[in-house]
Amino acid sequence: LQGLYIKVEDGSCEVIGSDLDLVIKAKLNVDSMVGGECLVNARILSEVVRKMSSGEIVFSDLGNEVMIEADKSEYKLRKLDHLTYPKALLENSFEQENSQKLAPFELFTALRKVGIAASPEGGKPILTGVFFDNDGEKTTLVSTDSYRLATNTISNLPIDDAGIVSYRSLNETIKLFEDSEQDIFINSTERELHFYNEKYYTSVRKLEGNYPEYQALFPKENVFSIEVDKKKILESLDRSTVVAEGFIPVTLKVVDENNLNISSTNKDIGGGVE
């Protein structure tokens, strides 16, 4: 899985990469003199292509190596054994007729809003994901790392069994499709969520387990409620938490109906007040 699987056939090139939690496929048209397939170290190949000057790049199969040429640059990379690549990753594991069209803007915007509260990789697995809580025509997206909670409700999501999906994988999917102004297709199976169009495809593994009862975390009544200017509160938080590191708590104190005091204290460094 450290390699990129490259397959060339009839003027089309397909590139596949995966870490098992996420599968990404990209298709592009090429001028091919001969078809074939190979597996090349993903990190090195990506770095080589990124550093090459813009323009035409030529790939040649030399048996145990792949030669890459562009302008005055030439690289020869040793191939990995493509026969060891998992066959399941080379084929689509869903029935295309069950796919639904999706205008991605609303979904992707909502995912980015709630994703900031998801636990980072390495934390409790279920909390690294976004929970799709369906209720009729509305779907509430939920994420929490147990310190904070974010929700956002969208309408008309064409599937109702998305479950819990890793935010890291969803964020990579957003990056892939965010520049497209056209609808994409979405397909949900028992274990995976699939997104695709004519050029790109991603398969995101669903997380197993039960998501926390997030609705119980909302208070039945508010001790106080304040309305603030978004830009001002973000700038104030940024200034007052310069000395905060990790999970140093931030204290919010309502001084009166017109003033809010924001402070943080780090016993090793100092403190800040806004």
Positions of PLM-derived features:
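Structural preference for solvent-exposed beta-strand-turn elements
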Residues: 1-274
